[in-house]
């Protein structure tokens, strides 16, 4: 039996078990709930490669069905969610799914391993959990999205009281549980994550805390430079890395905050050792470099709630950069981030570094201005401006949504140029009271009600993108969600 057949059979078996399991039997009530989320997404994208090669566009529509069942008996709860997607193109129906993130290797024109290419349509076992164990949504208690916001197999314990919040967990990806993906990404193979955090409300509305994350990767590096060219997702490093942060927070990511001023400040230190392949002139891996990592990043935000309908704010983020022979000051994120949060003060989770450019905090500096307007409870709008720079004008960026390649003798990124460009985002959401989720569940989903939403970003590349053929690129989504 093929792997796809096994997954399909498993989906059918899982659905059958849901129907006969006594935990989920009986009528819908306060302790037993089931339903389906129906999502229709229309996407228009042009051109993530900045006209340096063919492709880079997406135009189409997708239907995403997510039936789910949740039950609780005593102190034990369980949940299963399946997924079926049908689309006319490779459409992003889940902004937090790394398999649906656009991107490319700016260094070359080779595509990634075809076994990792998503199909237009697929079936998936999206989530399953019993108590604190399963394939579940891992999300930091501060909800900033730059540390943890992903679905992964894990043991995840949380505590949330009026004065103290705590979290601890272990995560490792074993499978994608999708009929269209045969293999894990190289970065996920043989990589284990241990994470935790603690927040204390030292004064009413003011929180102070820390987060820690450790990854251990004992996988294999590529054997030749050709392996890297043929698969842009080949493992880039192995080893052990540790992130440690301290932060101050005054409800910056709380859309229900009634405070006049909200702030956020976080400093993160990255340390550890990692191995990288070093290639000889013939392209073979002649040895592995042991690199000491010592890097930092900062993330700041300030929001003024002028009234209960209107606010304005600003944010700034910077990830350190710099490489040496046996040391690195290049910051990278944990790999479990979505970079999506409610930083504009509204319920909609928006990409912190641009809906179009979707940067990662590696060799990146971002300045942000935003304003939000909520004329009534069921309608909200955010207008956002971003300005992007490289920290080190000789180093590459992390993974992002802009992926030009070398063209006509011009490099994708020009040495000596820091200015990456600017972006304007417009997000509009209309909520509907119908389709509300049960009050005792819904943490796995971003939205608590049915809605229609416009997510749009217009990016204007600047001098650092030397080979660009386009002066702008856009990424626009219209999402319609209904729940039964």
From Swiss-Prot:
Keyword Membrane: yes
Record's bilayer topology term: Peripheral membrane protein
InterPro entries: Alginate_export_dom, Alginate_Permeability_Chnl
Pathway: Glycan biosynthesis; alginate biosynthesis
Signal peptide: 1-25
Subcellular location: Cell outer membrane
Gene Ontology cellular component terms for the protein in this record: cell outer membrane
Top-rank taxon: Bacteria
SUPFAM superfamilies: Porins
Residues covered by region (Disordered): 93-118
Bias-annotated ranges (Acidic residues): 93-103
Keywords attached to this entry: Alginate biosynthesis, Cell outer membrane, Membrane, Signal
Main location: membrane
GO annotation (BP), single: alginic acid biosynthetic process
Protein family according to the UniProt entry: Belongs to the AlgE family.
Function: Has non-porin-like, channel-forming properties and probably functions as an alginate permeability pore.
Protein name: Alginate production protein AlgE
């Amino acid at each position: 039996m093929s792997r796809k057949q096994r997954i399909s059979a498993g989906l059918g078996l899982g659905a059958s078990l849901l129907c006969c399991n006594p935990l989920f039997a009986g009528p819908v009530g306060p302790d037993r709930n089931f339903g389906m989320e129906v999502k229709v997404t229309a996407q228009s994208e042009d051109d993530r490669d900045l006209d340096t090669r063919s492709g880079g566009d997406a135009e189409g529509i997708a239907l995403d069905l997510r039936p789910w069942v949740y039950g609780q008996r005593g102190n034990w709860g369980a949940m299963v969610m399946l997924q079926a997607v049908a689309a006319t193109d490779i459409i992003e129906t889940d902004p937090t799914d790394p398999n649906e993130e656009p991107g490319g290797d700016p260094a070359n024109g080779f595509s990634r391993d075809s076994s990792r290419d998503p199909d237009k349509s697929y079936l998936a076992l999206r989530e399953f959990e019993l108590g604190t164990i399963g394939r579940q949504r891992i999300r930091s208690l501060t909800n900033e999205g730059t540390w943890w916001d992903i679905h992964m197999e894990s043991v995840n314990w949380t505590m949330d009281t009026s004065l103290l919040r705590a979290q601890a967990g272990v995560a490792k990806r074993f499978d994608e549980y999708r009929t269209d993906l045969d293999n894990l990404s190289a970065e996920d193979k043989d990589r284990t994550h241990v994470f935790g955090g603690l927040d204390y409300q030292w004064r009413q509305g003011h929180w102070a805390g820390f987060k820690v994350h450790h990854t251990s990767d004992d996988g294999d590096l590529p054997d030749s430079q050709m392996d890297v060219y043929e698969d842009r997702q080949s493992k880039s490093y192995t080893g052990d890395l540790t992130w440690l942060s301290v932060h101050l927070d005054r409800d910056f990511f709380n859309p229900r905050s009634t405070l006049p001023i909200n702030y956020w400040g976080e400093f993160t230190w990255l340390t550890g050792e990692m191995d990288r392949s070093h290639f000889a002139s013939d392209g073979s891996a002649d040895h592995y470099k042991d690199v000491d990592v010592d890097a930092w990043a900062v993330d700041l935000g300030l929001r003024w709630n002028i009234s209960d309908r209107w606010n304005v704010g600003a944010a700034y983020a910077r990830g350190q950069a710099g490489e040496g022979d046996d040391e690195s000051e290049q910051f990278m994120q944990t790999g479990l981030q979505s970079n999506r949060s409610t930083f504009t003060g509204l319920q909609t989770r928006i990409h912190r570094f641009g809906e179009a450019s979707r940067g990662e905090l590696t060799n990146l500096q971002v300045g942000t201005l935003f304003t939000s307007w909520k004329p009534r409870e069921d309608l909200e709008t955010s207008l956002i401006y971003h300005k992007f720079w490289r920290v080190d004008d000789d180093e590459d960026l992390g993974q992002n949504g802009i992926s030009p390649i070398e063209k006509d003798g011009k490099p994708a990124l020009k040495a000596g140029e820091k200015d990456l460009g600017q972006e304007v985002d417009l997000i509009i959401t209309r909520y509907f009271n119908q389709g509300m989720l049960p009050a005792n569940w819904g943490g796995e989903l971003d939205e608590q009600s049915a809605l229609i939403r416009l997510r749009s970003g217009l990016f204007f590349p600047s001098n650092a993108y030397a080979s660009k053929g386009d002066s702008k690129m856009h990424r626009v989504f219209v999402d319609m969600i209904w729940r039964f």
